[in-house]
Amino acid sequence: MKRLTSILMLVAICYLCPMSTESQNQPAAPTLAPSPSLAKGSRCFELRTYYAAPGKLEELHARFRNHTMKLFKKHGLEVVGFWGPTEKEKGSENTLVYVLAFPSREAREKAWRDFRADPDWQAAAKESEKNGKLVDKIDSVVMMATDYSPIK
C-alpha cells in the first residue's frame, strides 16, 4: 500500500510540472542543472500522457496489452504502472497515463531508440494504425526522485 501511495503521489506531483509534447524524431530535451534536492543514484523516471485520437482509446489499450508491453520488457523499459483518469475533464475520456523507470537518462534514451527501431514494434504500430492514427499527442516528463522521495 505504501508503494502504491508513493507511485500515485509521483503521478499527481508530475501533473504540476510543465509538460512538453514529444516528437518521435526530435532529439532529447536539454537537461536541467542538477538540483541538490535530487537523490543521488535515483533511477530516471518518465511520466507519459497519451491523448488518443477520438474513438481510439480502446485500440490504444489493445496495442499496449497485445504488443507494446512485451516490447517494453525486451528493450528495458520498466513499467511502473498505467492509469486512466476517473474525473471528467476536457479530453480525459481519451487519456492514458503511465510511468516508466530506467537506471539512468542514458539508459532511457538507448531503450527508446532500440524500441522504435524494432521491426516488431514498427509492424505492430503500422497494423494498429491501418484505420487511422491512435494517438493525437504525447506529453513526456523525464524526472529524477528527490532525496526525500520514498520511491527512487
Task: List where the protein language model places each region.
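Bacterial N-terminal signal peptides
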Residues: 7-18
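Positively charged n-region of N-terminal signal peptides that target proteins for export
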Residues: 1-4
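Short, low-complexity, Pro/Ser/Thr/Gly-rich segments in the mature regions of secreted, periplasmic
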Residues: 144-151
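Active-site-flanking beta-strand signature of metal-NTP-handling nucleotidyl enzymes
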Residues: 45-49, 97
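An amphipathic, aromatic/His-enriched active-site/gating alpha helix that lines ligand/cofactor pockets
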Residues: 24-41, 62-80, 88, 92, ...
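Short, surface-exposed ligand-recognition loops at beta-strand->loop->(often short) alpha-helix junctions
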Residues: 52-61
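Signal peptide cleavage region of secreted peptide precursors
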Residues: 19-23
